[in-house]
């Protein structure tokens, strides 16, 4: 009988601990999102990179929207595993915002870039970023021109280009499968100002 009481008590304590940890992780993720959005607002107003928390090794560099999907996320600098846990991020091997070349953004397939599964050719992608050279907030719209699935070693879509392009990359297939043997690539080209789509 004593064993049964200890077992029940231990089970209850374990349940409370596991529930508490789950609530803590959820609250931490929600708070991180709020802090990242605030940091982007400060960056967009001040023109100074502003980390979302004092010990962050990244900072918001852009806001990306896909209007047809209602997608609206803040893009972080440097696509490291730690950064990608908090949002889509710029690959440092690609062009910088507003610079000529292939601007490359990465995100997890089961969170930040999950909506890419339903992106279609002809969709508009809008990017806002602070241009430190011009000291102003800028916006550029892109038109999705190519969607493909490639092997992880096929990095041709991430190669530097002389033409402006926006390349979004995530693992494939979508969903929660532990394996991701391929990459899903969305390539978009800038829309000339004043041009209708």
Label every PLM stretch briefly.
Residues 2-197:
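Solvent-exposed, non-transmembrane regions of membrane-associated and secreted proteins
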């Amino acid at each position: 009988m004593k064993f049964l009481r200890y077992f029940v008590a231990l089970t209850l304590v374990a349940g409370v601990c596991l529930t508490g940890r789950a609530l803590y992780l959820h609250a931490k993720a929600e708070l991180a999102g709020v802090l990242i959005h605030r940091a982007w607002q400060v960056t967009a107003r001040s023109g100074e990179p502003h980390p979302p928390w004092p010990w962050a090794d990244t900072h918001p560099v852009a806001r990306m929207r896909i209007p047809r999907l209602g997608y609206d996320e803040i893009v972080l600098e440097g696509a490291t595993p730690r950064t990608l846990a908090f949002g889509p991020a710029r690959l440092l091997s690609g062009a910088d915002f507003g610079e000529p070349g292939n601007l490359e953004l990465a995100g997890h397939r089961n969170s930040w870039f999950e909506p890419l599964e339903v992106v279609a050719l002809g969709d508009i992608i809008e990017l806002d970023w602070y241009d430190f050279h011009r000291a102003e907030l800028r916006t550029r719209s892109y038109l999705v021109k190519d969607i493909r699935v490639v092997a992880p070693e096929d990095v041709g879509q991430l190669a530097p280009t002389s033409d402006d392009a926006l390349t979004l990359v995530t693992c494939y297939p979508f969903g929660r499968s532990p394996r991701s043997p391929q990459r899903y690539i969305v390539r978009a080209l800038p829309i000339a100002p004043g041009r209708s789509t």
